[in-house]
């Protein structure tokens, strides 16, 4: 029996057969082979199973397709390209999952001298690598030391002037309240400017941002040391704080460039020694140099620290931002498939409107139109799964360590394995796919309509870049619409502001009768609370993780509220005790050691609370933890700046006893927020769609 003739060679070649599904584009494979890929955990493996099964379904169906007449002649070229690209992405996933979790699993490739990136890159003694994770461990930890030392400067500048406030008042012929403005405005700069430095580093690279910012830091420190009046001092302190804030934002990104997630914990701990040592050393060294050479010596000391950092960065810090990114290759594949989206929809419609009787299997039997739809539907499913692969790869590879840029880092336990986080992340992936498809479709139409108007395109590009660099970093404020975020940040900010009430009161009260301590001794008064900061950061971090793990063992999942337990109760009890001890003993001029008991207790309590709230914030914003921490830093630095502005007038007006009794009451009342979150956190997560806020970032 003779069979009906097949489609023309052109059409037959366009049909997706079994061989095509196993092939990937040569160029993509080469990119994958030269890129470093690391395992993404069990989520990625779950995602990998479905595309493979779908491929088999597609192959079985498409092997049967033959037709009797060329009445349906759709252009299947885009479908074939999409099939190849998706197969390439699946092959990439297999390599991703099969890699051993080490950051040196691929042979290193040094960048030629002339192709190095960043300012003055040719004079760096350490060569740039295609992928910074290929550096030997000795080089990696040298870079960690450099950025840790550089990160000391910003927090150091917040407290270095505190022992010398009276000297500044006398030298610049001003008053204590005005000098406190220079301290508060510096804090404000530390909170605001990191939003932009981080954006700049992604656009221009880490090295260039470090070099520009520390060049400015050196210059503004010299200017501050030479300030002729209080107005110049305040203006220069704003610029000084803003330039020093770069490493607070970019340092975490550098750690992420150098280490895969499995290796970042130890590096993160070493890196954070710098920001933590700053507030501890600043009052001691500041008091010593101001006692010997006056308050201007504190700014020369800052200049020396920043200049040393600049030298280390210039000669020993190569660009670490990755040059070849496998994830970007995968994104390009998905963008390519989206560009063909309208053509694929046309093919789908053509199949839907075709005469089903004209389509036969290999035995000449008609194939229902639903099977043709299944072919196209399977491709759509594979595309969706491939997008999920890209999402998980990007999250695992690019998400840097989450840190609190002023206070000690508390161990962060990723909650992607909890049922809640899986549900949240899946919703986020779906929303992002829908948004990306819409944006790409609009972009394609816009490009087609304006391809003859280059001037408009250039102007539009400039406006887009300016918006992304200047305005978009402020979008993180939108997260304050999410109740858990605004509640936890409000309490964290109040607790942080209270720290500066203590710090400013120490320098004010101990410099007066009957104590009359010198600048050197004033600096030593900050040791008790600094020591308890270290203690609480160690104890609180382990306590935090123990609470989380105990809840997970009992209930089978990780929830953010499990971090808010007896650690918070201890802090709530210590807060009013510390405030009352310090406030009333310093008011009645008790023996100088007694008020320091209050500062030590407060330091321990505040670190327990701040550590727990920061980790709760990160866990409540899966995939956006860094954005949440930056927002938290912004709000609390604003409140800390306000505290430095008003503390001295309040001490003179109502006295330390009444002031710190009020602070104790505010802390006690605001701590009810944490108890409320403990009870209602799950309700907020279930009834408020944080994904809508993510889409606006």
From Swiss-Prot:
Residues 163-180, 237-240, 290-296, 507-519, 587-590, 648-653 are extracellular. Disruption phenotype: Leads to defects in biofilm architecture and attenuated virulence. Pfam families: MFS_1. One of its GO terms (molecular function) is polyamine transmembrane transporter activity. GO terms for biological process: amino acid export across plasma membrane; ascospore wall assembly; intracellular polyamine homeostasis; lipid homeostasis; membrane raft assembly; transmembrane transport. GO terms for cellular component: plasma membrane. Keywords: Cell membrane, Glycoprotein, Membrane, Transmembrane, Transmembrane helix, Transport, Virulence. Residues 53-69, 85-99 have a biased composition (Low complexity). It comes from the Eukaryota. Induction: Expression is repressed by HAP43. It is found in: Cell membrane. The chain crosses the membrane at residues 142-162, 181-201, 216-236, 241-261, 269-289, 297-317, 486-506, 520-540, 566-586, 591-611, 627-647, 654-674. Residues 1-141, 202-215, 262-268, 318-485, 541-565, 612-626, 675-697 are cytoplasmic. InterPro entries: MFS, MFS_dom, MFS_trans_sf. It is a multi-pass membrane protein. Residues 38-109, 338-367 are annotated as: Disordered. Glycans are attached at residues 175, 180, 516. Belongs to the major facilitator superfamily. CAR1 family. MFS antiporter that does not display functional linkage as drug transporter and performs functions that significantly affect biofilm development and virulence. No substrate for transport has been identified yet, but plays an important role in the growth in the host. PANTHER family: MAJOR FACILITATOR SUPERFAMILY, QUINIDINE RESISTANCE PROTEIN 3. This is MFS antiporter QDR3. It comes from Candida albicans (strain SC5314 / ATCC MYA-2876) (Yeast). The lineage of its organism: Eukaryota, Fungi, Dikarya, Ascomycota, Saccharomycotina.
């Amino acid at each position: 029996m003779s069979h009906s003739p097949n489609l023309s060679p052109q059409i037959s070649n366009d049909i997706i057969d079994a061989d095509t599904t196993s092939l990937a584009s040569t160029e993509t494979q080469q990119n994958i082979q030269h890129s470093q890929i690391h395992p993404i955990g069990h989520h990625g493996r779950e995602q990998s199973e479905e595309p493979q099964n779908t491929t088999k379904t597609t192959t079985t169906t498409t092997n049967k397709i033959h037709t009797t007449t060329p009445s349906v002649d759709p252009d299947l070229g885009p479908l074939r390209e999409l099939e190849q690209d998706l197969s390439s992405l699946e092959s990439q996933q297999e390599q991703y999952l099969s890699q051993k979790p080490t950051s040196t699993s691929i042979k290193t490739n040094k960048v030629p001298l002339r192709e190095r990136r960043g300012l003055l890159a040719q004079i760096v003694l350490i060569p740039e690598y295609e992928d910074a994770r290929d550096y030997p461990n000795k080089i990696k930890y040298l870079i960690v030391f450099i950025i840790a030392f550089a990160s000391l400067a910003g927090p150091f500048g917040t407290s270095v002037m505190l022992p010398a406030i009276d000297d500044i008042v006398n030298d610049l012929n001003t008053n204590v309240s005005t000098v406190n403005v220079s301290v508060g405005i510096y804090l404000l700069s530390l909170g605001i400017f990191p939003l932009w430095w981080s954006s700049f580093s992604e656009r221009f690279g880490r090295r260039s941002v470090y070099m520009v910012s520390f060049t400015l830091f050196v210059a503004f420190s010299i200017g501050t040391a030479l300030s002729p009046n209080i107005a110049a001092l305040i203006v220069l302190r704003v610029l000084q704080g803003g330039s020093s804030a770069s490493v607070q934002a970019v340092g975490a990104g550098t750690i992420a460039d150098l280490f895969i997630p499995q290796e970042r914990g130890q590096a993160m701990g070493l890196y954070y020694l710098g920001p933590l040592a700053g507030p501890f050393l600043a009052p001691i060294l500041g008091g010593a140099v101001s006692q010997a050479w006056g308050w201007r010596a504190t700014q020369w000391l800052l200049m020396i620290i920043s200049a040393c950092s600049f030298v280390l960065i210039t000669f020993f810090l190569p660009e670490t931002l990755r040059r070849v990114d496998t994830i970007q290759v995968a994104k390009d594949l998905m963008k390519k498939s989206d560009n063909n989206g309208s053509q694929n929809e046309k093919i789908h419609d053509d199949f839907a409107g075709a005469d089903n009787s004209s389509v036969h299997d290999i035995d000449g039997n008609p194939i229902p139109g639903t099977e043709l739809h299944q072919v196209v539907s399977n491709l759509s499913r594979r595309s969706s799964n491939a997008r999920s692969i890209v999402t998980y790869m990007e999250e695992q590879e690019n998400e840097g360590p989450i840190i609190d840029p002023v206070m000690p880092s508390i161990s962060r336990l990723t909650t992607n394995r909890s049922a809640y986080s899986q549900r949240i992340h899946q919703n986020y992936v779906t929303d992002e796919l829908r948004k990306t498809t819409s944006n790409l479709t609009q972009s394609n139409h816009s490009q087609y309509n304006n391809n003859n108007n280059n001037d408009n395109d250039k102007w539009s590009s400039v406006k887009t870049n300016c918006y992304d660099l200047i305005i978009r970093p402020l979008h993180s404020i939108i997260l304050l619409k999410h109740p858990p975020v605004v509640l936890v940040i409000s309490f964290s900010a109040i607790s942080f502001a209270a720290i500066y009430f203590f710090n400013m009161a120490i320098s004010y009260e101990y410099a007066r009768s009957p104590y009359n301590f010198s600048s050197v001794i004033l600096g030593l008064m900050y040791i008790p609370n600094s020591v308890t900061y270290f203690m609480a950061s160690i104890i609180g971090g382990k306590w935090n993780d123990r609470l989380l793990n105990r809840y997970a063992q009992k209930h089978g999942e990780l929830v953010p509220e499990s971090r808010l337990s007896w650690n918070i109760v201890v802090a709530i009890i210590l807060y009013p005790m510390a405030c009352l001890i310090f406030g009333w003993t310093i008011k009645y001029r008790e023996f100088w050691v007694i008020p320091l008991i209050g500062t030590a207790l407060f330091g321990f309590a505040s670190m327990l609370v701040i550590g727990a709230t920061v980790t709760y914030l990160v866990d409540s914003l899966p995939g956006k933890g860094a954005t949440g921490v930056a927002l938290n830093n912004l709000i609390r630095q604003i409140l800390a700046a306000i505290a430095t502005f008003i503390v001295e007038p309040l001490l003179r007006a109502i006295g330390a006893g009444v002031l710190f009794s009020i602070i104790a009451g505010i802390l006690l009342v605001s701590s009810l927020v944490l108890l409320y979150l403990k009870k209602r956190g799950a309700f907020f997560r279930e009834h408020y769609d944080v994904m809508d806020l993510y889409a606006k970032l």
